[in-house]
């Protein structure tokens, strides 16, 4: 087994040589996941994933004592995973570099904040960057959830494709319009809609957050 850091390109000659010799190549996320006894909530995206990971960690941690927040935000996944148990939750910030080396990584819930052009020096093409970001859903099933930005022109059709193929449950979010299915911001309220029926989740005045992007 070869475990590489996210900074090592998977197309480097050293990595290719190990793969050619039949040696499995994992990243830190895949290694940690192999030892995780609880549930994983994984967050990726070009922008906002660190803030989103922090906020989700605070929310989940308010309800579950054994909640671990990992990634670029603080502690690496591998330093926290041995504390996990069957009731624990790991909220993980996952970069595109880390998604390149997943094999069995299977989050119970994932989120993709947005996808815009980035890291093309590593991924070479926008198509490859998109493919890698979308890998966060690779092992998810209809028992799982993927949350994504309805206003993102790349993510919206990807979500529709996932739902059409019954690959994973998809929940969209939007700050620009009311959704028939999903979570949206409108007139100072955050609401959730299902089949056209809506329910108030929170009023933004009750939240200690600055900026519409944080309500998203």
Question: How should these model regions be labeled?
Answer:
Residues 124-127, 164-216:
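Adenine nucleotide phosphate-binding catalytic loops in nucleotide-utilizing enzymes
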């Amino acid at each position: 087994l070869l475990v590489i850091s996210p900074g090592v390109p998977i197309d480097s000659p050293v990595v290719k040589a190990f793969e050619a010799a039949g040696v499995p190549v994992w990243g830190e996320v895949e290694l940690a996941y192999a030892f995780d006894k609880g549930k994983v909530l994984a967050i990726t995206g070009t922008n906002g994933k660190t803030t989103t990971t922090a906020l989700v960690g605070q929310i989940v941690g308010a309800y579950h004592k054994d909640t671990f927040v990992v990634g670029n935000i603080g502690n690496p996944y591998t330093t926290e995973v041995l504390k996990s148990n069957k009731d624990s939750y790991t909220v993980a910030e996952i970069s595109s570099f880390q998604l390149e080396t997943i094999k069995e990584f299977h989050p119970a819930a994932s989120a993709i904040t947005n996808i815009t052009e980035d890291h093309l020096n590593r991924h070479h093409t926008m198509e490859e960057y998109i493919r890698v970001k979308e890998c966060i859903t690779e092992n998810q099933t209809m028992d799982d959830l993927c949350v994504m930005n309805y206003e993102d022109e790349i993510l919206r059709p990807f979500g529709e494709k996932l739902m059409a193929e019954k690959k994973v449950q998809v929940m969209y979010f939007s700050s620009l319009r009311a959704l028939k299915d999903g979570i949206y911001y409108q007139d100072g309220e955050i609401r959730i809609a299902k089949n056209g029926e809506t329910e108030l989740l929170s009023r933004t005045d009750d939240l200690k957050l600055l900026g519409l992007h944080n309500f998203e």
